[in-house]
Amino acid sequence: MKHIFLKTIILSLSLVAVACQGEKRRGDLSTLDKPFVESYNNERADAPNTSDEDPNTNQRKTVKVKQGLEIPIGKANVPSLLLYREGYTTSYNADTRTPNWVAWHLTAAHTNGPAKRKGITFQVDEDIPEPRVDTYDYMRSGYDRGHMCPAADNHWSQRAMEQSFLMTNVCPQNPALNSGLWNSIENQCRTWAEEYGDVYIVCGPIYLNQKHKTIGKNKVQVPEAFFKVILRLKDEPKAIGFICRNVSAKGHKKTDYVNTVDEVERITGMDFFSQLPDNIERQIEGKADIKDWN
């Protein structure tokens, strides 16, 4: 377990270095105003239930989960255009030319289905204002077009599969990370969805520095890292987070990148799974152990 918080330590050291230079890091909560809410308010008729034990009665009390549980509270003063897709919701940032976050509810049924990936190419998202990122921005850049919501999570619907290839669902990602550790985490999420029936997922880029490398004519900003947080409700509510540097993770395991959701919130300035009752949210976001998921 000694490597579990490896990436958190590295990110924390980055924060110290930036602070010493007198710069403000985008993920430093001390530089942010009170975040604005980007969430749904309508309850879903078939919303799943979770439960928590009442300490006064030792009885299990049922908690109704609202629609949009996966939608986070975003950072203040950050460009955000909400785009609602068949299989996910994304907050697009016109400054970075990447999503702030992408969120989706992954069910066991979503991991299998008739939708095929073959023949689908990455597409410009016509729903955003110009300049629009296109696939040519990534050509010979040294970075993959890294899906945030993976195509493999959208086999349940051909439309959802096609929309997963919109450029607003993509970030510049190190090729070895994309095909290696990040892909392994994506596969793990699908396994969890099959095991527990469904999971709620949020992921996106982390911009640590004041200035960032850019690629392409549209100057897509390259993130320094990526985050992913996952929530399950079946049996007993559990949450887990991952933070991965945007470099090759060859030689490392998923467990080396596990973080609590609280730590991911501290680094990103976001609030995840805020529709949960406060006591449950505090309980599950303050600890993370991948053994609890196996």
Task: Show which residues each predicted segment covers.
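Domain-level detector for secreted/extracellular nuclease and nuclease-toxin modules, and
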Residues: F5-K7, A19-N294
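Hydrophobic h-region of N-terminal signal peptides that target proteins for export
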Residues: S12-A19
